[in-house]
């Protein structure tokens, strides 16, 4: 299995995948294999005894998070690692600690479009012209 993780990687990528002391910075252009390095590193860590639930991988988009999850799954199967976006991590932390924050467990987070919808509904309920506040 270990050989499969390092197959098709260049020397610098292998070095990043196997890195084990302190932070590792990978600077490279688009399409150069950064996601491949990261997902292979996650698999490498798991193969070397790191508990999957101790691994956290964060990205900016849902598309990138799904791609990373799929790649890790293809390398080592289903894992308990958190692989998601900054927003989904924040939501997970809030949900797991909602009692400390005096929030109900079924709270919702709304975006700017939802806020406008709520404001328009309130204005309508108050018999105010919503166009005046648009």
Predicted features along the sequence, with ranges:
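P-loop NTPase Walker
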Residues: 1-104, 109
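DNA-processing P-loop NTPase/helicase core
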Residues: 29, 96-134
């Amino acid at each position: 299995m270990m050989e499969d993780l390092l197959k098709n990687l260049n020397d610098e990528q292998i070095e990043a995948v196997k890195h084990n002391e302190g932070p590792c910075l990978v600077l490279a252009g688009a399409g150069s294999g950064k996601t491949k390095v990261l997902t292979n590193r996650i698999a490498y860590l798991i193969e070397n005894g790191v508990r999957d639930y101790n691994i956290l991988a964060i990205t900016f988009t849902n598309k990138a998070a799904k791609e990373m999850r799929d790649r890790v799954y293809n390398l080592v199967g289903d894992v308990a690692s958190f692989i998601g976006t900054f927003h989904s991590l924040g939501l997970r932390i809030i949900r797991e600690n909602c009692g400390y924050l005096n929030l109900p467990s079924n709270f919702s987070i709304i975006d700017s479009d939802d806020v406008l919808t709520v404001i328009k509904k309130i204005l309508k309920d108050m018999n105010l012209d919503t166009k005046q506040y648009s």
